[in-house]
Curated annotation (Swiss-Prot):
This is Eukaryotic translation initiation factor 3 subunit H. Component of the eukaryotic translation initiation factor 3 (eIF-3) complex, which is composed of 13 subunits: EIF3A, EIF3B, EIF3C, EIF3D, EIF3E, EIF3F, EIF3G, EIF3H, EIF3I, EIF3J, EIF3K, EIF3L and EIF3M. The eIF-3 complex appears to include 3 stable modules: module A is composed of EIF3A, EIF3B, EIF3G and EIF3I; module B is composed of EIF3F, EIF3H, and EIF3M; and module C is composed of EIF3C, EIF3D, EIF3E, EIF3K and EIF3L. EIF3C of module C binds EIF3B of module A and EIF3H of module B, thereby linking the three modules. EIF3J is a labile subunit that binds to the eIF-3 complex via EIF3B. GO terms for molecular function: metallopeptidase activity; translation initiation factor activity. Residues 22-32 have a biased composition (Gly residues). There is a cross-link at residue 303 (Glycyl lysine isopeptide (Lys-Gly) (interchain with G-Cter in SUMO2)). PANTHER family: EUKARYOTIC TRANSLATION INITIATION FACTOR 3 -RELATED. Keywords: Cytoplasm, Initiation factor, Isopeptide bond, Phosphoprotein, Protein biosynthesis, Ubl conjugation. Component of the eukaryotic translation initiation factor 3 (eIF-3) complex, which is required for several steps in the initiation of protein synthesis. The eIF-3 complex associates with the 40S ribosome and facilitates the recruitment of eIF-1, eIF-1A, eIF-2:GTP:methionyl-tRNAi and eIF-5 to form the 43S pre-initiation complex (43S PIC). The eIF-3 complex stimulates mRNA recruitment to the 43S PIC and scanning of the mRNA for AUG recognition. Gene3D superfamilies: Cytidine Deaminase, domain 2. GO terms for cellular component: eukaryotic 43S preinitiation complex; eukaryotic 48S preinitiation complex; eukaryotic translation initiation factor 3 complex. It comes from Bos taurus (Bovine). Belongs to the eIF-3 subunit H family. InterPro entries: eIF3h, eIF3h_C, JAMM/MPN+_dom, JAMM_MPN+_peptidase_M67A, MPN.
Amino acid sequence: MASRKEGTGSSATSSSSTTGAAGKGKGKGGSGDSAVKQVQIDGLVVLKIIKHYQEEGQGTEVVQGVLLGLVVEDRLEITNCFPFPQHTEDDADFDEVQYQMEMMRSLRHVNIDHLHVGWYQSTYYGSFVTRALLDSQFSYQHAIEESVVLIYDPIKTAQGSLSLKAYRLTPKLMEVCKEKDFSPEALKKGNITFEHMFEEVPIVIKNSHLINVLMWELEKKSAVADKHELLSLASSNHLGKTLQLLMDRVDEMSQDIVKYNTYMRNTSKQQQQKHQYQQRRQQENMQRQSRGEPPLPEEDLSKLFKPHQPPARMDSLLIAGQINTYCQNIKEFTAQNLGKLFMAQALQEYNS
């Protein structure tokens, strides 16, 4: 699966010449305000994404695909999509870039929007803040500034509420990724925190008038709403699994903090040794000067005291961002259930 994610990012760069029209004069980069203020998705695209996961997604395995559409002012309209086929690393003959180009060429022949505007991915209990997603979205957004990534959560959707969110990398993070410098000093200079990594773009799902009429008629004929228990509590398995994933990420964060603290202690110790060495040389030079002897030759301190390599902090930011996502999911889950409990209590007191 990792190879497919890496291929996703590289394919965006390879197809930038084909999809350049999607970026209407914005150019490459990520500076300034966000180029996209709203994402409009056709209902057909949502159904295709859901169908793709139901057919090929299982367990922790995620499904991915390409989003097609166009840009109208500050609104990104997603009108079609197609999936990445499931393949293993043994399929050496499979060329993902060639597959995407063939698909877009076929769509162009039948007069369907074929401009590359992003990609989508399913998630497992909200576990999508990863380095692979960051690298892929950077490749897309660097080639096509308006690109977004749609994150589809099948577990939340199965509970009765469609979970589909659009994300983009913030301009600050785009600049840091361009420099490829994830040292503590670079992230501090860019004022990058886990809250300034991804920006969520509002989503609007659009259907034709005929589809809206059909859905209205089906809703009147459906008896599902009458049988649905509005005050039934959600399964505790979701909460337990999310808490387990949260604890795993907290453990990873603790290990990363230990590594960083070790680096800081070693750096501080080295600075003290360097300062003591300079003082000893200065005292010895003063003694040699008093005896009329020449001072000691200059030495390259960087060779004597090789600076420790600072640990990259991007992984720590990603872990912190994932922890924040888990906390938001737990907050949303518990808020819904607590609301149902209070409503059930009020109804019971009213009927008694």
